[in-house]
């Protein structure tokens, strides 16, 4: 394993640990999820480019599309919760009746 893969894997692990530690606020959780998606995107792109996988060349783009959809949905939930309750606590997600 090269140093680049180890650094990207550590970035993924740190984002995952941040998701576990800072799970009370929705904004912190969304930022940690974006960090995880970014490190996965970079790792998949480097893997496809170094191993010359022609069939898997679209998978990083598909992952980026899913990350954009996840970010849009998360931000819309954040706006709805902050307008309704005034805070961005994750525990308010259980109270939504939509």
From Swiss-Prot:
GO cellular component terms, A-Z: mitochondrial inner membrane; respiratory chain complex I
Gene label: MT-ND4L
Classification via InterPro entries: NADH_UbQ_OxRdtase_chain4L/K (IPR001133), NUOK/Mnh_C1-like (IPR039428)
Residue spans crossing the bilayer: 1-21, 30-50, 61-81
Cited Gene3D superfamilies: 1.10.287.3510
Subcellular location: Mitochondrion inner membrane
Molecular function terms, GO-annotated: NADH dehydrogenase (ubiquinone) activity
Enzyme Commission designation: 7.1.1.2
Catalysed reactions, as listed in the record: a ubiquinone + NADH + 5 H(+)(in) = a ubiquinol + NAD(+) + 4 H(+)(out)
Domain of life: Eukaryota
Record function comment: Core subunit of the mitochondrial membrane respiratory chain NADH dehydrogenase (Complex I) which catalyzes electron transfer from NADH through the respiratory chain, using ubiquinone as an electron acceptor. Part of the enzyme membrane arm which is embedded in the lipid bilayer and involved in proton translocation.
Swiss-Prot/TrEMBL GO biological process terms: ATP synthesis coupled electron transport
UniProt subunit comment: Core subunit of respiratory chain NADH dehydrogenase (Complex I) which is composed of 45 different subunits.
Record keywords: Electron transport, Membrane, Mitochondrion, Mitochondrion inner membrane, NAD, Respiratory chain, Translocase, Transmembrane, Transmembrane helix, Transport, Ubiquinone
Pfam families: Oxidored_q2
Protein name (Swiss-Prot/TrEMBL): NADH-ubiquinone oxidoreductase chain 4L
Primary location: mitochondrion
Keyword set includes Kinase: no
Organism: Lontra canadensis (North American river otter)
UniProt topology in membrane: Multi-pass membrane protein
Homology family: Belongs to the complex I subunit 4L family.
């Amino acid at each position: 394993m090269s140093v680049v893969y180890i650094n990207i894997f550590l970035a993924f692990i740190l984002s995952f640990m941040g998701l576990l530690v800072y799970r009370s606020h929705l904004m912190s959780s969304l930022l940690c999820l974006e960090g995880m998606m970014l490190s996965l995107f970079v790792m998949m792109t480097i893997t496809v480019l170094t191993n010359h996988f022609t069939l898997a060349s679209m998978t990083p783009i598909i992952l980026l599309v899913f990350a954009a959809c996840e970010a849009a949905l998360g931000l819309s939930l954040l706006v709805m919760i902050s307008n309704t309750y005034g805070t961005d606590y994750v525990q308010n997600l259980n109270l939504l009746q939509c």
